[in-house]
Amino acid sequence: MWGCGLAWAQRLKTITVGSSGADFPSIQAAVNAAPETGAVIRIQPGIYREVVHVDKPRIQLRGETKDPSKVVLVYGNSAASTCGTSCSATLFVTGDEFFAGMMTVANDYSKHSDVPSQAVAVKVTGDRAVFRHVRLLGAQDTLYAASEKCMDGRSPCAVKRQYFADCYIEGHVDFIFGDAKAVFDRCEIHSIPHLAGGYLTAQSRSRPEQGSGYVFNGCTLTADPGVENVYLGRPWRDYSTVIYLNTKMGSHIMPAGWSEWKSAPVPRLPTATYAEFHSSGPGANPRTREKWSKQLTAAEARKYETKVFLAGMDGWNPTKVK
């Protein structure tokens, strides 16, 4: 089921991608051929080395597999080789009501270069985006879950809603970052080695009224062997908001949980919203957490449930989008 209750109810055109009897050999060619009303793009197993821009609404990228590692979209740009972090992604999504399922999106810059640089796998600035059973692979700045025009502190601005369910997201420093309003349900957030430890998130809510934030619900925080000194997040902007609900945390998570953005002109932790509810595992240490963070009550946690947090004015419920 796709987009239950949406005003557009017409059947979407289907386009195929692959090397065996498909409509197009590349994903970008299929996106280019899609009508403005949207399309279901079915992708055969294979490795697609390209940069993809999805600038149309209602585009679905669906891997034709039950194993997301068999359909791989990958490229190796970096902040240093392009106009900066925002230009380095393998997949750019600006169109609303995007869907991706059963595929991998990767940025493999770090595998081919010893020069550290931000290198984004996915940059999403569309509203009502859904990712299901998707693997996102990178190192620094893997997933840019953003709202585009809110970062400069202007308000009001249009905060974009994004939903990630049963996904695997890998990286080391700030590898889930930006100012979207996003929920991560039942995802594995995996830390890979970095000399200085790492940070799972760098959420960038600039003003309290903007309403963006990240919620991790029922997730698992894992790491490669030997990885340690990893923080749950640090505040990229003054009102950074990150909530962990019912999340299992490995021993690589620092007891303090949260870190200051050390180059900020003034401390940001006092104005950030960092909280947990029913964390478990060796990385769950409520008594040693940074003093500005909070342990939520059950009543407080309810407002971060997916159907509540992402509802918006249109009552969006992404759990029904399959």
Provide a role label for each language-model segment.
Residues 1-3:
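Sec-dependent N-terminal signal peptides
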Residues 10-322:
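Sequence-level preference for short, compositionally simple segments enriched
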